[in-house]
Amino acid sequence: MANLCKRVVDLEKYIVKEAPPTVYYIPDFISEAEEEFLLQQVYRAPKPKWTQLSGRRLQNWGGLPNPKGMLAEKLPDWLLEYTEKISALGAFAGKTANHVLVNEYKPGEGIMPHEDGPLYHPTVTTITVGSHTLLDFYRPVCQAEPDAPQTEESRYMLSLLVQRKSLLILQDDMYKCYLHGIRGVCEDVLSEHVVNISSTGAQVGDTLPRSTRVSLTIRHVPKIIRANLFLGKK
């Protein structure tokens, strides 16, 4: 664990310069053995830990974010190892990640374009295991120009190829100003709009079949409520 946290990565080496500020993409952030370990831990979780949504299912670890404050719950050791590892990179400006959302996407499943919102420190970090995905980015609907085309296609900006074992970090404009989503398809055809393709070993025109992907979205929730305060104890 100590050796893990001592690992220092110069994030600037991994910045995706073709994207607006700021995207860091680190291929092979974890090993094959770590990937297998994480998958085992995810699927060992008790059935009530899963929440089924349209197009995916998820596990929530660390508490339920709320505008009034998140009632903090201790993360399990298998997640603490990775929240500490990512926090040690400086991803959260010296703060420590305290929340993990585990999402499972089967082939053909996805999520509509959305933003993560103000409940979190304005950084989102994601470890991907099991399969790749293509993460698409969109400009928000423009209220000032109601007559302008507002379709997803017209607002589409770019994509990121997010591979197995990678770490993706989104900050600044890419977190605050744009929406991100995953199309519900069974395979991805890589186009010139995949701006991190040079970091992936893939090529424009490649067709990548999806299998089941598990993502660990690791974030810092600034506003928390300690359990003893919630229960009225001193």
UniProtKB/Swiss-Prot annotation:
Gene3D superfamilies: Alpha-ketoglutarate-dependent dioxygenase AlkB-like. PROSITE patterns: FE2OG_OXY (PS51471). 2-oxoglutarate binds at N103, Y105, R213, S215. The keyword 4Fe-4S does not apply. It holds the Pfam family 2OG-FeII_Oxy_2. Its cofactor is Fe(2+). Keywords: Cytoplasm, Dioxygenase, Iron, Metal-binding, Nucleus, Oxidoreductase. The keyword Nucleus applies. SUPFAM superfamilies: Clavaminate synthase-like. GO terms for cellular component: cytoplasm; nucleus. InterPro entries: AlkB-like, AlkB-like_sf, ALKBH6, Oxoglu/Fe-dep_dioxygenase_dom. Its EC number is 1.14.11.-. Its main location: cytoplasm. It is found in: Cytoplasm; Nucleus. Residues 96-222 form the Fe2OG dioxygenase domain. Fe cation binds at H114, D116, H180. Binds 1 Fe(2+) ion per subunit. Belongs to the alkB family. Probable Fe(2+)/2-oxoglutarate-dependent dioxygenase involved in oxidative demethylation of nucleic acids. Binds nucleic acids with a preference for ssDNA or ssRNA to other types of DNAs. May play a role in nucleic acid damage repair. This is Probable RNA/DNA demethylase ALKBH6. The lineage of its organism: Eukaryota, Metazoa, Chordata, Craniata, Vertebrata.
